[in-house]
């Protein structure tokens, strides 16, 4: 069959530059010997170099046309092509419950969702690499005090060391995206336990960053009553982008300890969804 036509509704931008594809494939070398799962292989420009790593490889592709192309041009991959939506997969079943490396030239329209799913399976994914929008990569790698520091930054950096590796320009894609891209690598840090109530931690992070112009005192009033003595702590005069991951962990412990009846804590996504049109 001929070349696959990129589909806008799937966020497809096919990489044309083989040297960049090889560089992306080489980012998985930090986790040697582990099997590899590639998301959104398209026509296999990255896949061909991943397969040279001599490790078990599976690919997940939703586009039926791309699947047909892969089956025709990568016969050795035949039994390891998963025609499905990555976001709906049970990742525990892919490699018999064993850890694996996640990589890909990720579809731009779901890149953030891919990383939230990665966090759900963080104990199975010690390393995640790949290419995404430059803006999203900068957010993930951002530190406290940065305008791009946000929900993704905190939640990912709580569990992973993040490396912004290099920038990729628009002209090496078909079709060229309207934004620059970047290659990043996320490697699990030594954290095995967060040191706080993880569900409350996520709620506080999402709630405060969805109201990032407000001080913590105002943004978490839905969780902690303003009359609570804890609200007098100077930390509540800060805005969320001023806090490190560790400070968010400490804040979570303070808030939980201050609540009189812990069973009354509402771990509701409804609170966290406030301002969901804002960037994560």
Swiss-Prot record:
Fetch the NCBIfam families from UniProt: ksgA
GO terms, molecular function: 16S rRNA (adenine(1518)-N(6)/adenine(1519)-N(6))-dimethyltransferase activity; RNA binding
**Keywords for the protein's UniProt record, in alphabetical order:** Cytoplasm, Methyltransferase, RNA-binding, rRNA processing, S-adenosyl-L-methionine, Transferase
Q: Which residues bind S-adenosyl-L-methionine?
A: 13, 15, 40, 61, 85, 105
Record's family?
A: Belongs to the class I-like SAM-binding methyltransferase superfamily. rRNA adenine N(6)-methyltransferase family. RsmA subfamily.
Parts of the chain that traverse the membrane: none
Name listed for the protein in its UniProt record:
Ribosomal RNA small subunit methyltransferase A
Per the record, what are the reactions this protein catalyses?
A: adenosine(1518)/adenosine(1519) in 16S rRNA + 4 S-adenosyl-L-methionine = N(6)-dimethyladenosine(1518)/N(6)-dimethyladenosine(1519) in 16S rRNA + 4 S-adenosyl-L-homocysteine + 4 H(+)
Q: What does this protein do?
A: Specifically dimethylates two adjacent adenosines (A1518 and A1519) in the loop of a conserved hairpin near the 3'-end of 16S rRNA in the 30S particle. May play a critical role in biogenesis of 30S subunits.
Q: Name one Pfam family in it.
A: RrnaAD
Query: Where located?
Result: Cytoplasm
Q: What is its EC number?
A: 2.1.1.182
Q: From which organism does this entry originate?
A: Phocaeicola vulgatus (strain ATCC 8482 / DSM 1447 / JCM 5826 / CCUG 4940 / NBRC 14291 / NCTC 11154)
Keyword S-adenosyl-L-methionine carried by entry: yes
